[in-house]
């Protein structure tokens, strides 16, 4: 094995023992998340309750919809997303905005897994599990 390849493997093994979120790791996670469902970002559509409950509730009640429970509990993030979409964007961009928020939430969860303040075993495998879920 060549010296550069051995050095690369040593660095990879070191990272695997003590994983940290670097820009490269974040970019790889984002790419893998995108490849999981590319149609969600390339041809976005509203899904399930996004349009029929949260956007309609936003249209009917405005900001008061944030405090309306649905199916027994509050859906703060979907209702905040509906409020932001309705107040900031053209209706044609609402599905893309919903999917971008979902993408950002997934990336935030993956980034949190790699936090040094969070003691978890086998962080790379946990991240892989989240990506495959």
Which stretches of residues belong to each language-model region?
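Helix-to-loop transition at the C-terminal end of transmembrane segments
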Residues: 33-51
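Transmembrane-helix motifs of polytopic, lipid-linked glycan transferases
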Residues: 100-124
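Transmembrane helix-loop junctions and nearby membrane-interface residues
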Residues: 34-37, 83, 87, 117
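Aromatic-acidic/polar surface patches that form glycan- and anion
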Residues: 20, 24, 43, 47, ...
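Alpha-helical transmembrane spans of integral membrane proteins, capturing the lipid-embedded, hydrophobic core
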Residues: 26-30, 75-79, 83, 99, ...
């Amino acid at each position: 094995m060549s010296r550069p390849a051995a050095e690369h493997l040593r660095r990879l093994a070191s990272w695997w023992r003590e994983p940290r979120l670097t820009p490269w790791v974040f970019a790889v996670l984002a790419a893998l998340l995108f490849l999981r469902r590319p149609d969600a970002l390339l041809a976005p559509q509203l899904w399930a309750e996004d349009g029929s409950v949260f956007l309609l509730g936003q249209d009917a009640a405005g900001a008061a919809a944030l405090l309306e429970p649905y199916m027994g509990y509050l859906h703060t993030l979907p209702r905040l997303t509906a409020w932001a979409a309705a107040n900031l964007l053209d209706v044609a961009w609402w599905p893309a905005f919903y999917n971008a928020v979902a993408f950002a939430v997934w990336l935030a969860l993956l980034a949190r897994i790699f936090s040094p303040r969070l003691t978890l075993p086998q962080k790379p495998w946990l991240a892989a599990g989240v990506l495959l879920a």
